[in-house]
UniProtKB/Swiss-Prot annotation:
Keywords: Endoplasmic reticulum, Lipid biosynthesis, Lipid metabolism, Membrane, NAD, NADP, Oxidoreductase, Steroid biosynthesis
This protein's encoding gene: erg26
Name under which the protein is recorded: Sterol-4-alpha-carboxylate 3-dehydrogenase erg26, decarboxylating
Pathway noted in the entry: Steroid metabolism; ergosterol biosynthesis
Positions of NADP(+) binding: 17-23, 89-90, 111-113, 188, 192, 217-220
Protein's organism: Aspergillus fumigatus (strain ATCC MYA-4609 / CBS 101355 / FGSC A1100 / Af293)
PANTHER family: BIFUNCTIONAL POLYMYXIN RESISTANCE PROTEIN ARNA, SHORT CHAIN DEHYDROGENASE_REDUCTASE FAMILY 42E, MEMBER 2
Taxonomic classification: Eukaryota, Fungi, Dikarya, Ascomycota, Pezizomycotina
The family this protein is said to belong to: Belongs to the 3-beta-HSD family.
Matches recorded under Pfam families: 3Beta_HSD
């Protein structure tokens, strides 16, 4: 007999950034996967290829009972039936209060972030730090009366807050310190770490005693992914067979790649646990024991199955029809390509462009970077539902199907 799915009752949930990559998947799960039942919002996949046939997600993730609202800067795209959508600016108190008065959320899930690849420091700080603080204080009742009380606030941080972008990380847990200031070479990660500190410090400190937590996903990929999956397949499409045989480093470096649906699931579990904690506090009971505590805590979120970096890259290429056999691989030294990347960055920088090979790409292709998610498994009840290979099948299938649809529209 099929296993009975648990039910998560979450009340009124406001997903901030709900039209983005992760946010869309959170909304889809909250609404019990209209993407699998409504043809108008179905995720495309290649037809007639069993490699892209996967079990239904709705049969495996919990059923949710929630009133779902979405706040994003622009909500014209990536909509799902069953949710209410609001255009808003998290850096504007006035904009947020107007939306909160309509939604009256019990839970805020904050996924909105400035794009890490833009490199605009002013924008990164304005959105990731100042915007998070404004949203947090509006939700907690410190910035005006919106006629309700938000009970729980879940913040999407990043596993990169524990990483200096250079060192190898092996099974790192939440005891590892945040990498801040001069030690942090990536400004995006510094802003995410600062925002995380603000969110966790705000736990039970607001007029409404709202409880908070932060989740740190590592290497998110999946349908609608515009970073890892898209760029790996873009490279496969443009590169010659000779270039595809080139491997940066020795491929002994394990790396975390986490399916976006599992990350979305962790957010719903966190919201559910926070609501349970808030109920305890409101009823006068003592809070959870330290080793069970969710509020005021940060959690690493992974697929609990690190993979060799080039194995998953070549697996993605193979799904797209670009197969590179192990005996065809040419191993190139990181010590050689790092300086080459630096030279290319300098040359391309003179004409205002970014080369395809940079020092960052070389380092990330060669480093070991994986985390422990034991804390999330124990305290949130988290366990990845979709495996890394299935997630890759879903992610690659989506990109290939979208490309086919776009070609058909153009009449090519």
């Amino acid at each position: 007999m099929p296993q009975k799915r648990p039910t998560l009752e979450l009340g009124s949930v406001l997903v901030v950034g709900g039209c983005g990559f992760l946010g869309w998947h959170i909304v889809d799960q909250l609404l019990n996967f209209p993407s699998e039942t409504d043809a108008s919002v179905a995720l495309p996949k290649p037809e007639g290829d069993s490699r892209f046939d996967n079990p239904r997600l709705a049969d495996r993730y919990p059923r949710c009972v929630a009133k779902v609202s979405v706040l994003d800067l622009r909500t014209a795209n990536n909509r799902l039936p069953g949710a209410q959508y609001y255009d808003g600016d998290i850096t504007s108190e006035e904009s947020l209060l107007a939306i909160f008065r309509k939604v009256k959320p019990d839970v805020v899930i904050h996924t909105a972030t400035a794009n890490v690849l833009e490199g605009n420091k002013e924008l990164l700080r304005k959105v990731n730090v100042d915007g998070t603080k404004t949203l947090l204080e509006v939700a907690g009742g410190d910035r005006g009366d919106w006629g309700g009380k938000c009970k729980a606030f879940v913040y999407t941080s990043s596993a990169s807050v524990l990483h200096d972008t250079q060192s190898d990380l092996k099974n790192v847990n939440e005891d590892w310190p945040l990498i801040r200031g001069k030690l942090q070479l990536e400004y995006y990660s510094d802003t995410k770490a600062e925002a995380e500190e603000i969110v966790l410090k705000y736990n039970r400190a607001s007029p409404s005693s709202m409880v908070t937590c932060a989740l740190r996903p590592a290497g998110i990929y999946g349908e609608k992914d515009t970073t890892f999956t898209f760029k790996v397949l873009e490279h496969a499409a443009k590169a010659s067979p000779t270039v595809l045989r080139m491997q940066l480093g020795d491929n002994n470096n394990l790396f975390d790649f986490t399916y976006v649906g599992n990350v979305a699931y962790s957010h719903l579990l966190a919201a559910y646990r926070l609501l349970a904690t808030q109920t305890r506090y409101e009823s006068g009971q003592s809070g959870p024991l330290d080793h069970e505590k969710v509020d005021g805590e940060a959690f690493n979120i992974t697929n609990d199955s690190p993979v060799y970096f080039w194995d998953i890259t070549r697996a993605a290429w193979a799904l797209a029809g670009k197969v590179v056999e192990p005996n065809q691989v040419w191993q190139l030294s990181e010590d050689l390509l790092g300086p080459v990347g630096a030279v290319l960055e300098t040359v391309f920088g003179l004409i205002g462009k970014t080369p395809r090979l940079t020092r960052r790409i070389v380092r990330y292709s060669c480093m070991t970077r994986y985390y422990s998610c034991e804390k999330a498994k124990y305290r949130l009840g988290y366990s990845p539902i979709v495996s890394v290979p299935e997630g890759l099948s879903r992610a690659v299938g989506y990109v290939l199907a979208r490309e086919r649809l776009e070609s058909e529209k153009k009449g090519l």
